Amino acid sequence: DIEPIIKSVVDDFNNIYKLKRWIQISYVNDKKNKYFINGIENRIEQIVANLLDNAVSFSEDNKEVIVKVSKSKDNKVIINVQDEGEGFKEKDTNKIFKRFYSNRPDKFGQHSGLGLNIVKNLVDLHNATIKASNRINQKGASIEIIFPIP
């Protein structure tokens, strides 16, 4: 069950950013289901942590980041991280997963451009897929990982 792994990372980030920048990170499991995948626990933690770090980095103070877990119609497990930041400027969002690529504005500080590349490599390791898009009808970005059925 990946829920305890995700909740642990969300709690860690809330402990840091709730007081530091008043950013609320919410975990959503609408169906209250258990979600099982074949995966390496510390790598799943790293995926979620890197996605949250990226989402928080692009978020203004007093905003929300949402981590949602669900199942697709064909029972694949989906982890979706959404922020209320500026969204993606790139038409081809696959660019953001390239090594050393960064579109981070200076006001958000410098980063190596490796975080999302590491996520992509770990997602590939789990035979999963990842896609990035701008949120529909509101400001922000959405990154979705779809894990195969165990």
Locate each region found by the language model.
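Acidic ATP/Mg2+-coordinating residue in the GHKL
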Residues: 83
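Short conserved segment of the HATPase_c
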Residues: 88-100
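Short helix-loop "hinge" at the ATP-lid/N-box region of the Bergerat-fold HATPase_c
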Residues: 55-56
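Short alpha-helical Gxxx[C/S/T] motif in the catalytic ATP-binding
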Residues: 115, 119
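A conserved beta-strand-to-alpha-helix junction within the catalytic ATP-binding
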Residues: 1-14
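Conserved micro-motifs of the catalytic ATP-binding
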Residues: 34-39
